[in-house]
């Protein structure tokens, strides 16, 4: 195709071939495998060579209508040059936007696609104003805040009894006062001996009648003489001590003592 005096050749063609016979590239077959020319070549009424730059994006059925708007607004030669400077993986996006801009320019020769941009911006402004109005309306409809409940009085904490700390070795007195050097330990043993002897004598006095063979009749007679039990008991004690070989203690009573016959 001749566009502006330059022949358009591109790499990576396909999708459509040149109609009417064999082609120099492809061994006598058509450039697109016998499917007919691409939409761009069909609109331009030219032979679609293998590697046509428009073939991947404009098919032979509906591509002619889209390419007509592109050619009218931008020109086929300018679009082919633009696509050659774009990476292959981004050319599809470029073709879509070019077609959109071309159709918008045909519908609105003054603003083109900018008219659509202005309409979207105005829509955003209207939506923001509506959101602000709704927020203010909701703020006026909010229920009053409930009254804060009085804080409960803090309950008195129970008093816990703190046990005294355990005694340690350090709590003991540093020194213990020793016994006086003049203290006579023999007196302790003498007192212990005398107390044990006294306890032994008391045990002997528990039942003197059985120990010394005194009959119950004679003892009862002796105790009952004169009707004075205290003097009889005292006399009996003197008699028993005399039999054991101990001198009887001095009598404290000046009344005459009664003795028992052996």
Curated annotation (Swiss-Prot):
Q: What is this protein called?
A: LOB domain-containing protein 18
Every copy of the LOB domain together lies at 36-138
Explain what induces or represses this protein's expression. By auxin.
Question: Can you name the source organism?
Answer: Arabidopsis thaliana (Mouse-ear cress)
Localization terms from the record? Nucleus
Q: Name one Pfam family in it.
A: LOB
This entry carries the following GO cellular component terms, namely: nucleus
Q: Which cysteines are cross-linked by disulfides?
A: none
Result of knocking out the encoding gene: Reduced number of lateral roots.
Asked if the Swiss-Prot or TrEMBL record annotates the protein with the keyword Nucleus, the reply is: yes
Other comment = Plants over-expressing LBD18 have a dwarf and bushy phenotype, with short petioles, curled downward leaves, ectopic shoots from the adaxial side of cotyledons, shrunken root tips and disorganized columella cells.
Function (record text)? Involved in the positive regulation of tracheary element (TE) differentiation. Involved in a positive feedback loop that maintains or promotes NAC030/VND7 expression that regulates TE differentiation-related genes. Functions in the initiation and emergence of lateral roots, in conjunction with LBD16, downstream of ARF7 and ARF19. Transcriptional activator that directly regulates EXPA14, a gene encoding a cell wall-loosening factor that promotes lateral root emergence. Activates EXPA14 by directly binding to a specific region of its promoter.
Source gene?
LBD18
Q: What is its main location?
A: nucleus
The organs and tissues expressing this protein are described as: Expressed in roots, stems, leaves and flowers. Expressed in vascular tissues of hypocotyls, leaves, roots, developing floral organs and siliques.
GO terms for biological process, alphabetical: callus formation; lateral root formation; positive regulation of DNA-templated transcription; xylem development
What is known about its subunit structure? Homodimer and heterodimer with LBD16. Interacts with GIP1.
Where does the record place the region Disordered? Answer: 223-262
Which keywords label this protein? Nucleus
């Amino acid at each position: 195709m001749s566009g502006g005096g330059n022949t358009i050749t591109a790499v990576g063609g396909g999708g459509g071939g040149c109609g009417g016979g064999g082609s120099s590239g492809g061994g006598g077959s058509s450039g697109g495998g016998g499917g007919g020319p691409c939409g761009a070549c069909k609109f331009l009424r030219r032979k679609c060579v293998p590697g046509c730059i428009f073939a991947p994006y404009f098919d032979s059925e509906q591509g002619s209508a889209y390419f007509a708007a592109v050619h009218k607004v931008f020109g086929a030669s300018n679009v082919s040059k633009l696509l050659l400077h774009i990476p292959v993986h981004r050319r599809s996006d470029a073709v879509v936007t070019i077609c959109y801009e071309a159709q918008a320019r045909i519908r609105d020769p003054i603003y083109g696609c900018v008219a659509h941009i202005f309409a979207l911006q105005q829509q955003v402004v209207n939506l923001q104003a509506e959101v602000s109005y709704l927020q203010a309306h909701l703020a006026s409809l909010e229920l009053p805040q409930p009254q804060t409940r009085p804080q409960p009085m803090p309950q008195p904490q129970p008093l816990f009894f703190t046990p005294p700390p355990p005694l340690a070795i350090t709590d003991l007195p540093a020194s213990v006062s020793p016994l006086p050097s003049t203290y006579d330990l023999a007196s302790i043993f003498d007192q212990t001996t005398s107390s044990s002897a006294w306890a032994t004598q008391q045990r002997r006095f528990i039942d003197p009648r059985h120990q010394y063979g005194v009959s119950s009749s004679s003892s009862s007679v002796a105790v009952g003489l004169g009707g004075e039990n205290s003097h009889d008991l005292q006399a009996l004690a003197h008699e028993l001590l005399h039999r054991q070989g101990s001198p009887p203690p001095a009598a404290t009573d000046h009344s005459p003592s009664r003795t028992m016959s052996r």
